[in-house]
Regions:
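Interfacial segments of alpha-helical transmembrane regions
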Residues: 1-2, 60-88
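N-terminal transmembrane-helix/juxtamembrane module of multi-pass inner/ER membrane proteins
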Residues: 1-54, 93-114, 210-213
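Aromatic-anchored segments of alpha-helical transmembrane domains
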Residues: 9-11, 83-90, 151-163
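Transmembrane helix-loop junctions in multipass membrane proteins, especially transporters and channels
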Residues: 18-20, 69-73, 94-102, 163-167, ...
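Membrane-helix interface segments
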Residues: 37-38, 70-75, 139-145
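Hydrophobic alpha-helical transmembrane segments
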Residues: 46-68
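Hydrophobic, lipid-facing residues on alpha-helical transmembrane segments of integral membrane proteins
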Residues: 79-91, 174, 178, 182
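Membrane-embedded catalytic cores of phosphoryl/pyrophosphoryl-handling enzymes
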Residues: 106-213
Length: 213
């Protein structure tokens, strides 16, 4: 998982650096012009994936974990994943220095207040993907499916709102996958080394989860 994420980010950054982005602008136009009825839903999704939204999600997850007498380790992992993905995204933004699409693409529709910082990669996507990957193995299958769908929709919403290109979302997803994968590896080591008495308090990742990636 971590290696795949790193590769996805590297390819995205290489495409941006070499200027092979004509497809990116074309796809941006398609996703930026979807029906206006989706504005409230996609705007809400992006707000839920903001730093404040992530804190709220982690807090709610903590309540969920405590209510079921489970370990807080997965919640801690989610918080670490969010912080690491956010920092790495802003470092990459400073290096790439790509203008936002609404600043340079003729006819681009901006459906929110102008965003701060540069475009590549999408920090919203990076944080969301990192947290979802870190927490999905510890969630019931239904909630895990919802979480994965949420991460995908957040990425799409950033393009629809006019603040990111699709390539920015792919780069952010790569960072999120890399960070989330490292967190899962660390969790695997911690759970494997946990004393027998503590094993019952920390849920093992499901066998069909990406924890072994």
């Amino acid at each position: 998982m971590a290696g795949l994420g790193a590769a996805l980010f590297a390819v995205s950054a290489l495409l941006l650096k070499t200027g092979a982005v004509s497809w990116d602008v074309s796809l941006f136009r398609v996703l930026n012009e979807v029906p206006a009825a989706l504005v409230p839903v996609l705007t809400l999704l992006s707000r839920l994936a903001s730093p404040v939204g992530i804190i709220a999600v982690v807090a709610l997850t903590l309540i969920y974990v405590v209510a079921r007498n489970r370990s807080v380790l997965p919640v801690t992992a989610g918080a670490v994943a969010a912080g690491a993905a956010l920092v790495l995204s802003h470092v990459a933004k400073a290096l790439a220095d790509r203008p936002r699409p609404y600043e340079v693409v003729a006819g681009a529709v901006l459906r929110q207040q102008p965003a701060h910082g540069t475009s590549f990669p999408s920090a919203h996507t990076a944080v969301t993907v990192a947290v979802v990957i870190a927490l999905v193995p510890f969630l019931p299958q239904t909630l895990a499916a919802v979480a994965i769908a949420y991460a995908v929709l957040v990425g799409c919403s950033r393009v629809y709102l006019g603040v990111h290109y699709p390539l920015d979302v792919l780069g952010g997803a790569g960072i999120g996958m890399a960070v989330g994968g490292v967190i899962l590896l660390a969790l695997g080591v911690l759970l494997h080394r946990a004393p027998a008495g503590a094993a019952g308090r920390a849920p093992e990742p499901r066998e069909n989860s990406p924890a072994t990636g």
